[in-house]
Amino acid sequence: MFVGSIIMALNRLNDYLFKWLFGQEDRKPMLLDLINAVLTDGSDENIIVDFEFKDRELDPQKLKDKEATLDILGKTSDGTLINIEVQVENQHDIDHRMLYYWAKNYSLQLMSGEEYTDLKPTICICIMNFNYFPRDRYHSCYNVLERLDHQPLNNDMNLHFIELKKWADLKRKPLNRLERWLLYLANNNPKELEEAAYENRYIASALAAEVNFGLDDNDRYWYDMREKFLMDQGSINAKVARVEKEAKEAKKEAKEAKKEAKEAKNKLKEAKAEAEKFKALYEQLLNNKK
């Protein structure tokens, strides 16, 4: 129905494709469905009904910066800011990065003369293709809470992290709207995608939109450039991880060698003490014979 070779060849976690799919005015209903799926943890409730894009265009200058993040930013009818992005490679800083994005978007709301009470909630959503947090749940949400009774300070901070690999490791059919979107983003097989499309018309719309993606040479060019960058980044991260592992092992071996050297030194010291003891005893025996 919707699934063809061009669809299966696409990496939906490519940030250029993600923004192309979800960052367009005519495909806003798709984005709203994905956002609501995250905010309601998969229920069918729609708490966000409108979304005004703050950056609708794919800026060519931004695209030239290989390390630029092609996120989607907008606000709801009540002024709530929402930022959503995908991350493929683990840079080991996603917690700091998302907190920085949140703080930047939150602080830039105020104009000169406005009150702090005019600040609106800011929501950041990060869909990650790697595991990061020490828990089995694939969806983590962070707010500002009181240390002992866990009462929220307010509702202005919401950081959502979706760890795709943790969901994939469950090896089950989607149980709700959020999991159907995760199946779509995780590039699963055609049969599963068609089932998800039949159950969610917005996923069907996304698959239909993909058919047109490769028809524009400019879009395909930037998609390929981002893919190359992601591959290079993955290769660099793998090399760094390997070097760090080797350094850690070398440090461990050096520590063990140092420990062994210390033990050998202590044994030598004990052996010398024993030798001195026997030498003294031998000299005493000689003196007694005299």
Predicted regions and their residues:
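Compact structured core domains
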Residues: 167-170, 177-188
